[in-house]
């Protein structure tokens, strides 16, 4: 169930994991202007913040429209479990392979999960996980910067 939350209360630490699509974002902005935000932003409750995982385009549109509140749905309090949940749904939601790779690298490096654990949790093969980890490892910093957006100045508001 979605609740209304203050836009400024969101921690955007994963914004740089998601690709920007300006044309799609412009269409979304127009839609939100006409009908409001129809699908809640999704995140995880990590004290003292709400960490946004899904809905960065909606977030940026809300900020452009100077909305004070947005609909928000919590994916729980366990950050690793929430990321795994987002990845499980990535076939139904449009996470690109690069976005998947960034989240999997986060699970491996920061959350200290190994490839077999990640594969098992996602019901995927170890090679599926390894391919995405390899993709992140092979990207130079310059290419990664061009493909993935720069973090917003508000990225770590509550950390």
Model-identified regions with their sequence ranges:
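Short, charged/polar connector segments at secondary-structure boundaries
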Residues: 1-75
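Amphipathic, charge-rich alpha-helical segments that serve as recognition/docking helices
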Residues: 17-19, 60-138, 144, 155
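Short, proline-centered helix/strand-breaking motifs
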Residues: 38-40, 137-140
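Short, basic, alpha-helical segments at the C-terminal edge of helix-turn-helix-like DNA-binding modules
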Residues: 147-152
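A short helix-loop-helix "switch/interaction" segment in the helical subdomain of ASCE P-loop NTPases
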Residues: 158-159
């Amino acid at each position: 169930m979605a609740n209304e939350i203050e836009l400024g209360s969101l921690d955007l630490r994963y914004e740089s994991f998601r690709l920007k699509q300006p044309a799609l974002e412009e269409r979304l902005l127009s839609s939100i202007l006409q009908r409001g935000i129809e699908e809640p932003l999704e995140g995880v409750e990590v004290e003292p913040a709400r960490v946004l995982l899904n809905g960065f385009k909606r977030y940026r549109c809300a900020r452009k429209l100077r909305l004070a509140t947005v609909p928000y749905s919590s994916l729980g309090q366990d950050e690793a479990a929430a990321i795994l949940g987002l990845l499980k749904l990535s076939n139904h939601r449009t996470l690109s392979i690069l976005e998947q790779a960034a989240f999997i690298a986060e699970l491996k490096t920061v959350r200290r999960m190994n490839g077999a654990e990640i594969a098992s949790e996602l019901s995927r093969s170890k090679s599926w996980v390894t391919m995405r980890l390899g993709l992140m490892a092979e990207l130079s910093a310059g290419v990664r910067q061009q493909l993935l957006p720069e973090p917003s100045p508000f990225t770590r508001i509550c950390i």
